[in-house]
Every structure is written in structure tokens, then in C-alpha cells.
Amino acid sequence: EVQLQQSGAELVKAGSSVKMSCKATGYTFSSYELYWVRQAPGQGLEDLGYISSSSAYPNYAQKFQGRVTITADESTNTAYMELSSLRSEDTAVYFCAVRVISRYFDGWGQGTLV
């Protein structure tokens, strides 16, 4: 069973940056797509981007280009998402979700409140 464990809640100031982690257990980072999404209060899910084992570069949602950085450390089965130049509207719960290639989402993190 795929399980994702995210880092804890963050209290940050406007203009600063936040970096959160997502550690996977139950499978190894060999063939996957790891997504980051967020949910602001009263809003639906919003995609930030994803990283794939089949590509050398992450894919970022256009809205967050230049502010978001997604990386993965395959040696520790951990993915990271950093969001910079934070604004009040970035207040949300941030989730990671993994899809093993050719399957639906196999696991979700519990969320990180920012």
C-alpha cells in the first residue's frame, strides 16, 4: 500500500518562502508522477505542478511559474515543494499525491497547512 507522509504545518510571513516534504512508503520512486495540489479555504483543488520519473524536468502550472520548485530525492523516496514570494492568498492546505505510471492516484498525503 502506498502511503505519503507530509511535513507539518508552517507559519510563514508574506514575501517569504516555504518548503514542504512528502515521503513515500510502500513503493520506490522508480516509475511515478508526484503531484502537488492545494485547497484554499472554501475553494476547490488547485494544481501547482508535478514531477515525473520519465522527465528530467518538473512540470509547473502556469499560474505558479517562477514561484514553485518541485524536486524529488529518489534515494530517500521523498519529494519536495517550495513556494516563494508568499502572499495571503497562498494560505491553503497543500497535498501531495502520487500516481504510479498507468494507474490512478495510488496515495495522498495528509496535507500541510500554510
UniProtKB/Swiss-Prot annotation:
Signal peptide: none annotated. Disulfide bonds: none annotated. One of its GO terms (biological process) is immunoglobulin mediated immune response. Pfam families: V-set. Keywords: Adaptive immunity, Immunity, Immunoglobulin. One of its GO terms (cellular component) is immunoglobulin complex. GO terms for molecular function: antigen binding. Residues 1-106 form the Ig-like domain. The keyword Nucleotidyltransferase does not apply. InterPro entries: Ig-like_dom, Ig-like_dom_sf, Ig-like_fold, Ig_sub, Ig_V-set, IgHV. The keyword Chloroplast does not apply. SUPFAM superfamilies: Immunoglobulin. Antibody isolated from ten mice was exclusively of the IgG1 subclass. There was no heterogeneity in the heavy chain V region sequence. This is Ig heavy chain V region. It comes from Mus musculus (Mouse).
